[in-house]
C-alpha cells in the first residue's frame, strides 16, 4: 500500500489528488439496504440518501473524482452476480439511491441508463425478467416497423436538403417499468417502447426537421417538448414530439444537434475536453474554467419538485455555494450528519446523543487528533 506522499512522488500531484478524493468517497454508503415506502424509517433513509448525495458532491472538489467513482460503481454493478444475494440488494439499493441521481444530475445518461437497468435486475428481478421476456417477444416485428419509419424519415429529411443522422433506439427497461408502475399500465398499453433520434448540425436544422416531421405525420396534442429553448436543469437539450405512425401506432422522435447529443450522452464529461471533426480534421476543444463553473452551478440545481419558489431558492442558494454552509460527518453506525457551517467535533457528538457529547474527551478529523472545539 502506498502513502499519499509516495503516490505523489511516483505519479505526480494530479494523480495523488484524484486518488485522495476517490479514497475519501469510498466510505459513502447507505446503512440500510431496504426502503419500503410504508416503512416508518423510509423518510429517515431518504433524508440520509439526500445527505449522502450532497456530501458526495461537496467532498469531490474535482469533478473527475465523481466521474471515476461513477465508472467504478458501474464496474461493480456489472460484476454484481459474483456477490451474495444480500450484498447484491445492498449495493443495488445504494446505487439506485446515490449514484443514479448523481449521474442524472451530471447529465451522463449512458451511465445512468445502464445503472438503472442493473439496479432493477437485482432489486426487482421478477419484474425485470418478465419485462425482458415480453419485450423480446415482439422484437423482430418492432425492429421491422422501426426500420420502416427510419427509412421514411430519412427520405423526407434528405429531400429537404438537410444533412442528418437518423436511427431508432429502444427505451431502456427501467424507464418502461417506471412508466408501467406510475401509469398503472401493462406493457401492451405502453406505446412508446422505442424512439427515433435525428442528429443535425445546427439549431435551425432542428426546427426545420420538426416542421417536416409534423407535416408528414400527425402530432399528438400535448406531447411536444422544446428542451432546446428551455433546457433541463442538467443541460439536456432536444426537441421531443410524439406522432401517429402509418399503422396508427404512436411513436416518439427526438431531434438534436451533434453537440447536444454529446452533452445528453456524457453530460459534464463532454464539456471538459472533447474532439471535434471539421472537414475531416480532428481538433480538440477545451472548455474554459468560467464555462466549467457555470456548468457546475447549473447541474447542482437538484431536480426535485419544489412545493413553492421559496423552497426552490433556498435549495438553489445552498447548491450554488457548493454546500459551503454545511459540515458533513459520519456517525459510528454510518449515518451522515448534516451540520451548519462552523460546527465543531463537540457539536457533532451532541448531534448523535447527549450522552456521547457529555463523555467526549477528544476528536480525530481526517486522521488527525484535534481539540473538541476544532
Residue ranges of model-derived segments:
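Active-site helical microenvironments for divalent-metal-assisted chemistry
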Residues: 1-195, 200-251, 256-320, 325, ...
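Ubiquitin-like/PB1-type beta-grasp interaction modules and other compact soluble beta-rich domains
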Residues: 307-341, 346, 351-374
Amino acid at each position: 500500500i502506498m502513502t499519499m506522499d509516495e503516490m505523489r512522488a511516483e505519479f505526480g500531484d494530479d494523480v495523488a489528488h484524484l486518488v485522495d478524493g476517490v479514497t475519501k468517497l469510498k466510505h459513502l454508503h447507505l446503512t440500510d439496504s431496504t426502503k419500503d415506502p410504508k416503512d416508518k424509517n423510509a423518510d429517515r433513509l431518504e433524508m440520509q440518501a439526500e445527505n449522502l448525495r450532497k456530501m458526495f458532491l461537496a467532498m469531490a472538489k474535482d469533478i473527475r473524482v465523481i466521474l471515476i467513482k461513477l465508472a467504478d460503481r458501474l464496474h461493480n454493478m456489472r460484476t454484481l452476480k459474483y456477490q451474495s444475494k444480500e450484498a447484491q440488494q445492498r449495493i443495488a439499493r445504494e446505487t439506485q439511491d446515490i449514484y443514479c441521481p448523481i449521474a442524472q444530475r451530471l447529465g451522463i445518461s449512458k451511465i445512468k441508463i445502464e445503472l438503472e437497468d442493473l439496479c432493477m435486475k437485482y432489486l426487482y428481478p421478477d419484474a425485470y425478467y418478465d419485462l425482458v421476456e415480453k419485450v423480446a417477444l415482439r422484437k423482430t416485428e418492432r425492429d421491422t416497423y422501426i426500420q420502416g419509419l427510419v427509412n421514411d424519415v430519412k427520405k423526407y429529411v434528405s429531400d429537404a436538403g438537410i444533412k442528418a443522422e437518423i436511427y431508432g433506439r429502444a427505451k431502456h427497461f427501467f424507464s418502461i417499468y417506471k412508466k408501467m408502475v406510475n401509469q398503472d399500465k401493462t406493457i401492451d398499453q405502453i406505446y412508446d417502447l422505442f424512439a427515433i433520434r435525428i442528429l443535425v448540425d445546427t439549431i435551425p436544422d432542428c426546427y426545420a426537421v420538426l416542421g417536416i416531421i409534423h407535416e408528414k405525420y400527425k402530432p399528438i396534442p400535448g406531447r411536444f417538448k422544446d428542451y432546446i429553448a428551455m433546457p433541463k436543469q442538467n443541460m439536456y437539450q432536444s426537441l421531443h414530439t410524439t406522432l401517429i405512425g402509418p399503422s396508427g401506432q404512436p411513436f416518439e422522435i427526438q431531434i438534436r444537434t451533434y453537440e447536444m447529443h454529446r452533452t445528453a450522452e456524457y453530460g459534464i464529461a463532454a464539456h471538459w475536453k472533447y474532439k471535434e471533426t471539421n472537414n475531416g480534421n480532428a481538433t480538440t476543444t477545451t472548455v474554459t474554467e468560467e464555462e466549467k463553473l457555470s456548468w457546475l452551478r447549473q447541474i447542482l440545481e437538484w431536480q426535485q419538485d419544489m412545493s413553492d419558489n421559496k423552497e426552490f431558492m433556498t435549495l438553489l442558494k445552498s447548491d450554488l455555494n457548493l454546500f459551503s454552509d454545511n459540515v458533513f460527518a459520519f456517525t459510528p453506525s454510518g449515518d451522515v450528519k448534516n451540520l451548519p457551517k462552523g460546527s465543531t467535533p463537540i457539536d457533532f457528538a451532541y448531534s448523535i446523543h447527549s450522552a456521547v457529547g457529555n463523555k467526549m474527551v477528544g476528536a480525530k478529523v481526517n486522521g488527525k487528533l484535534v481539540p473538541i472545539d476544532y
